[in-house]
Amino acid sequence: MTLFARIPKVDKILEWDGTKVLLGIHPRPTVLNAVRSVLDSLRTAARSGFLKEEELLEGAVASRIEREVARSTAFSLRRVVNGTGVVIHTNLGRSPLSKRVKPLLDEIAFGYSNLEFDLEKGERGSRYSHVERLLCDLTGAEAALVVNNNAAAVLLALSALAAGKEVVVSRGELVEIGGSFRIPDVMGQGGAILREVGTTNRTHPRDYHQAVSEQTALLLKVHSSNFAVVGFTAEVSATELVAIGKEHSVPVMADIGSGCLLDLSPFGIRGEPTVQEFVKAGVDVITFSGDKLLGGPQAGIIVGRREFIAPLTQHPLLRALRIDKLTLAALEGTLRLYRDERLALAEIPTLRMLTASAAELATRARSFARRIRRASPPDIRLTLTSGISQVGGGAYPLLELPTTLMAMEADGISPQEMEIRLRGMEVPVTGRIHRGRFLLDVRTLQDDDIPFIAAALSSLAD
């Protein structure tokens, strides 16, 4: 009898004791789907000649079915330990929220709220009112609006203010913002006509002056936060662009990307303009993200002059891009922390990680290492070494943040295997491999990550 013919049938598997236990815990369709999935993989292996006889033993098949049931019933979106040293890690969810936001999220998520109800007037209200005043107070802008992400904010602004007309932008600012989404594509989708000026590395005020015509709806400035052009370069500042716009009676819009609300230069973090700087420069419409340097949830934030924000609030596209109540609650909770700069720096994880000093990180690393060593097998070797962290999230591409790394080694386990096994844990642990060692960057580790790291390292000895 061939191995293919020996693969057990579904009805036989359902009679196994192990399967009956699973059926007593999980819905029958869940177990059946797991059985069929395992049988499909066994048949595929048999056809390709890679199936081994021991893989058909009842215990082996039952174990695979149990693992498949566990996989299919587990949440797909899970907590991950970020030991990569990339603070605003796009693939790991960007900025973690402050725990100060949790009480408000709990209240809004599990009950009714005044999302679109004016409690004073007893009539329909606006969901945007919950953060508009806050944003205006924090940035100095006249009006504000929020949507579901910054690309949506740019799309809405261009659709409302420049559909069918020209938008003048420097060639050096036609950036790709990630996921193959490019500024020219967003502009085209919004119905705007792109008018490029200058060159990749140099754009001058005269380039804008010469490009303005009766068809010009906007002068657009895009902050190149995710790359840097160095050497023989020239660009037109926001202040200069506003002056050009006023001379020609053309409004100015700026997509500044990361959306920093605090001056981080005292911490050695320079080069990212704050939202307030663009407002003071007189830019009419400013868009930025909520989940990058701001340290909140994914959102697209629009601030600026009332006469230019008003058309956005009436545009049909706004409903398709509108922010949901949980994101709105998380954003309001985060923004309220900015009323006290010291509180924001202490309580918003992204800011706390970015501004941590090298000495502070070294102290934390020694503390973390002691805790991990106490809970890990003796054959796990942990040493501390210096290294570099990155901001991530398309901000400060050239900035290197000094940090302390925990280097993990184990006999008989390569760094690549260690990385795979730690990533496969119930709470995955991610890090990076450099010069033959698996590394965890203390900057992006949280205090409550340590038990998960210790448990993951202990599993290596099993």
Curated annotation (Swiss-Prot):
Transcription keyword on record: no
InterPro entries linked: PyrdxlP-dep_Trfase, PyrdxlP-dep_Trfase_major, SelA-like, SelA_trans, SelA_trans_N_dom
GO molecular-function terms, A-Z: L-seryl-tRNA(Sec) selenium transferase activity
Key words of the record: Cytoplasm, Protein biosynthesis, Pyridoxal phosphate, Selenium, Transferase
GO CC aspect terms: cytoplasm
EC nos: 2.9.1.1
Key word Cytoplasm present: yes
Pfam families linked to this entry: Se-cys_synth_N, SelA
Subcellular locations according to the entry: Cytoplasm
Pathway note: Aminoacyl-tRNA biosynthesis; selenocysteinyl-tRNA(Sec) biosynthesis; selenocysteinyl-tRNA(Sec) from L-seryl-tRNA(Sec) (bacterial route): step 1/1
Modification N6-(pyridoxal phosphate)lysine occurs at: 292
Reaction catalysed by this enzyme: L-seryl-tRNA(Sec) + selenophosphate + H(+) = L-selenocysteinyl-tRNA(Sec) + phosphate
Top-rank lineage group of the source organism: Bacteria
Function of the protein: Converts seryl-tRNA(Sec) to selenocysteinyl-tRNA(Sec) required for selenoprotein biosynthesis.
Family named by the database record: Belongs to the SelA family.
Stated name of the protein: L-seryl-tRNA(Sec) selenium transferase
Organism expressing this protein natively: Geobacter metallireducens (strain ATCC 53774 / DSM 7210 / GS-15)
Phylogenetic classification of the source organism: Bacteria, Pseudomonadati, Thermodesulfobacteriota, Desulfuromonadia, Geobacterales
Gene that this sequence comes from: selA
